[in-house]
Regions:
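Short, acidic, metal-binding catalytic loop of nucleotide-sugar glycosyltransferases
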Residues: 24-32
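Short beta-strand/loop segment that forms part of the nucleotide-sugar
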Residues: 32-40, 61-65
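Short acidic/polar active-site loop segments enriched in Thr and Asp
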Residues: 32, 89, 121
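Catalytic-site signature of metal-activated, phosphate-bearing donor transferases
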Residues: 73, 102-322
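Active-site-proximal specificity loops/subdomain of glycosyltransferases
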Residues: 44-93, 101-104
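N-proximal low-complexity "stem/linker" segments adjacent to membrane-targeting elements
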Residues: 1-24
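Ser/Thr-glycine-rich phosphate-binding loops at phosphate-binding pockets of nucleotides
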Residues: 10, 37-45
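Short acidic donor-binding/metal-coordinating loop in glycosyltransferase active sites
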Residues: 39, 95-96
Length: 324
């Protein structure tokens, strides 16, 4: 296991205020490489990633968007052009609002792999959605510290769809035809032989079909901060969804992810390590200034959207929701 390498692959558009905390988190987990694909950014995202690349923390890829769409184009290019992906022992695909949170061993990505059984090809980690919990303003603070209430765990009768969506870390890349947002797609000849498990090793998919094993948060979860604050959500709406480019985000999306059922601060196990690295990153004069510009850009953008009368149909019910 000592020679194994771990790579994160992500796609971003206008996510600059969140980059440093997110990068620090995945470094704290023990990932060796981070590849970030971007497209059409108008905020400091690309400048920050290029500086992080100069400092040796990430690799930046400018996505050439093809007919397959933004996400699929990015992942296809990532998987074919970069040794840090092609030669990686394990690859994890996630977005900047998703934080892997391992409850096994020392909390590292290696502990997740070691604790999920031998001969495993894919470990599918369930989402745990964290809501805005009444936060309306965008502030310069890690999302993991701002938003600490998430959805209840899976229950067969009360919450049968909790954990339905997963993010996967996988190995043995020759078994798969391509990366996927939630899981890699197996080659037809390997569908029946690909071992897909949940964290801890329980079978997740057998012969291409989901098992009845519940997607619990016992061993690991992916904290999913889909909304963040109300102001952050407005910017997300303006940016659009990379994987569903024709969808306009509104109250239906907000209500779906506005889940603040119970407090969960388990991700704090990484707090000291991430804070230390973020402090080091901000000490770099160029990166520190870019981060400040990023926060200011997003605050201005959110303020302008809130002042736009054409947005009242959304901003009014959003404010009512966060203040409820």
């Amino acid at each position: 296991m000592s020679n194994d390498t771990y790579t994160v692959v992500s796609t971003m558009k206008n996510e600059s205020p969140y980059i440093l905390d997110w990068v620090a988190h995945y470094k704290a987990l023990g990932f060796d490489h981070i590849l970030v694909c971007t497209n059409d950014c108008t905020d400091p995202t690309v400048d920050m990633l290029l500086r992080l690349q100069e400092l040796g923390f990430v690799t930046h890829h400018p996505t050439i968007v093809r007919k397959a769409g933004i996400h699929r184009s990015a992942l296809r290019q990532a998987s074919r052009r970069y040794d840090i992906v092609m030669d990686a022992t394990w690859v994890f695909v996630c977005d900047v609002d998703e934080y892997l949170n391992v409850h096994m061993g020392d909390g590292s990505v290696r502990a997740l792999v070691q604790g999920s059984g031998k001969d495993t090809d894919v470990i599918s980690v369930p989402w745990r959605v964290f809501g805005p919990d009444g936060v309306d303003k965008l502030i310069d603070k890690p999302v993991t510290q701002q938003f600490t209430k998430g959805e209840f765990e899976w229950d067969e009768k009360e919450r049968p769809t909790t954990g339905k969506f997963v993010k996967s870390i996988y190995t043995n890349q020759d078994k798969f035809q391509r990366m996927g947002l939630h899981a890699p797609v197996s080659l037809e000849e390997h569908v029946g032989t690909t071992k897909r498990v949940l964290p801890g090793g329980a079978d997740y998919v057998v012969d291409g079909k989901r098992t009845d094993n519940p997607p619990l948060f016992t061993h690991a979860q992916v904290n999913h901060y889909a909304l963040r604050s109300m102001e952050s959500f407005l910017i997300k709406r303006a940016r659009g969804r990379a994987n569903h480019s024709s969808h306009v985000l509104g109250m239906e999306y907000w209500d779906r992810f506005n889940l603040n059922d119970e407090k969960d601060t388990s991700i704090d196990r990484y707090k000291s390590a991430t804070e230390k690295l973020v402090k080091e990153l901000k000490a770099d004069k160029m990166l520190g200034e870019l981060h400040k510009k990023a926060v200011a850009w997003h605050k201005r953008k959110a303020g302008a959207m809130k002042m736009d009368p054409e947005m009242d149909e959304l901003t009014v019910p959003l404010l009512q929701s966060v203040k409820a």
